[in-house]
Amino acid sequence: MGGGFLEQLFGGPGSQQAAPPSYATAPIPQYEPAPGYEAQPAHPAVSPRFMKQKVSYEGNERPGTLIINTQERLLYLVQENGRAIRYGVGVGKPGFAWAGTRQITQKREWPDWTPPDEMLKRRPDLPRHMAGGIDNPLGARAMYLGSSLYRIHGSNEPWTIGTAVSSGCIRMRNEDVIDLYEKVKVGTKVVVI
């Protein structure tokens, strides 16, 4: 044989057998995280109950309407033929919950956040302004409700979905708020119960 690939592979004349690799058993040194990349606390996963899903709808609202049930912590986008898309949400904590009917008056991608004066009085540690981005508490999208300070927005704290934690805004997982944002328009009716 001519010393080709098969001979090398299967041990023909002139072949050289490779030695099996050796593995070191020395312990791997422990390193500290780089500055600014400290380990973050683990948070529980979002309950499957609060994941986006298609459900039946038997109410009286027209297709395209948003219904937010603050007790269930669920938002419904009413669709045709007795169907709805359901999303889990975080809602206002005790003393900050509200109900009523509004319209979406603005939509913003990666919105800036300026805490209102009332919030700054309660939380003077908050920044006075924060540019949009992954650290911004409004998340990836925001839909503004009427002339109020309330919004339906994303969150950089997805583990809070299904809880009463906000100052009255309706928060969603970022992937869900992006999905909803694409499905609604300015003028959409929002019913909060």
Where is each model-derived feature located?
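Short beta-strand-centered segments at strand-helix junctions
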Residues: 167-181
